[in-house]
Amino acid sequence: MAILNTLALLLLLVFLVCCLALAAFIGSLLYMVVLHHRLKEQGLRREEELLATPLPPDAELPHVVVQIPSFNEGPVLRRGIEAAARLDWPRDKLHIQVLDDSTDDTAVLARTVVAELREQGFDIVALQRTDRSGYKGGALHEAMQKTPYDYFAIFDVDYVPEPDFLRTCMRPFFANPDWAFV
């Protein structure tokens, strides 16, 4: 009988420890959920504040270089380049670099699209390397060395940004001039 009483007490003790552990787990989980929601709210408020930062007049906006790296991506090339040309930014401050390391006929298409947009008054160049060291990252780095401007937007060729992309993304830089990227 004493063994049964001891066993019953031991089981009761194990049960109570498990209940306490479960309560601690649930309490921790609730704390993390509440903390997550508070931080999310703070982040959303901060984002709203940053996006409400007014842009200066067009004449005072900085130059922005849009880089579009590509490698054998002919089917999406024209769409990506033309989307960059549709960005709502002063044309004299928008510089587009098509960084095409293609080994197929995409390079010809890139030069054709670039020539068409240059005729329309865009500052756009097609840069092609024979040495593909670093792949797309190498192309981006090499092209950055060829421009005096500080602001860059990098889009993969299959990405189609909304026309207001630059106006939206540049706002935080005016609220925080010491920021390096958004």
Where are these regions (language model features)?
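Internal catalytic domains of large membrane-associated glycosyltransferases
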Residues: 44-182
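N-terminal membrane-anchoring/stem segments of glycan-assembly enzymes
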Residues: 1-58
